[in-house]
Amino acid sequence: MPRKLLGVLLAMIAFCAIVRAADDPFLGIWQLNGEKTSNYQQQSQMIINVPAPGGFTSYRATIGKDNQSSTETHPVAFDGKPYQTTGGDAREISYKRVDARTIERTQNRNGKISVDTEQVSEDGKTLTVKQANAVRVYEKQFDVKPAKR
């Protein structure tokens, strides 16, 4: 993993450790499980979800099949409004909470709309992202808990 990307990830882990968080099962650090993932064009991806007003902020660090890295950030707010991503994969994203463990994500990439479902398992250890022709499976590496005072 490139040093710069590793540095960003370590900084986010430290940040997560001190942040107060609600009991949202999506919060934490998620690592792509390539063996359980189907039809995904990237070599690896880590998702870091940290608390933010109205939902959370999602940071995504990706290593492509060509070993090139990219990062992308976007707010996850459940207000139905589209928000622009920053970084590698430019698009607008809006979110709808289906239930406590399921969210629906609508993406607009240059006028092309796609919808996927993200669901956290009952035990909170697996995040599954279902798209039209792909399934990505992530395993929780680090759980964000409220800071003790």
Language model regions located:
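Positively charged n-region of N-terminal signal peptides that target proteins for export
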Residues: 1-5
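Bacterial N-terminal signal peptides
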Residues: 7-17
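Hydrophobic small-molecule pocket/channel-lining residues, especially in calycin-type beta-barrels
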Residues: 21-149
